Amino acid sequence: VELTAEEKAAVLALWDKVKEDEVGGEALGRLLVVYPWTQRFFDSFGDLSTPAAVMGNAKVKAHGKKVLHSFGDGVHHLDNLKGTFAALSELHCDKLHVDPENFRLLGNVLVVVLAKHFGKQFTPELQAAYQKVVAGVANALAHKYH
């Protein structure tokens, strides 16, 4: 990911304030509500029949936290995203057969959730930096598909 030193510092500073459980659950939940076809990868999660059911689902929240923890690993290894996400890329490609477009969608949803949680702190400049990061993570996760 091509970030300036200032962008990297800003991304890391905000990430240190992110509550992975809250933001992760909300981001994954929103992905499943806004893009309902993504629910097919989560058959074992129980009731996903309504937006309220999705957003209140304990398995969605738990997996969202796990996803965000992995994303945080990427934030702390911006110079080696492909290496950081190699195993997850292989898992999602070979075993789970997840459409790599879903990584881009989740990244964009994550930016929305960060904006919601951080309000004015999430400046347009910070959003631009995070868009670069989520694009880089999505690309790294899609790496094994190429």
Swiss-Prot record:
Domain Globin: 2-146
Keywords: Acetylation, Heme, Iron, Metal-binding, Oxygen transport, Phosphoprotein, S-nitrosylation, Transport
Residue ranges of coiled coil: none
A single GO BP: hydrogen peroxide catabolic process
CDD domains per record: Hb-beta-like
UniProt subunit comment: Heterotetramer of two alpha chains and two beta chains.
UniProt function note: Involved in oxygen transport from the lung to the various peripheral tissues.
Family membership noted in the UniProt record: Belongs to the globin family.
Listed name of the protein: Hemoglobin subunit beta
Species this chain originates from: Ceratotherium simum
Gene: HBB
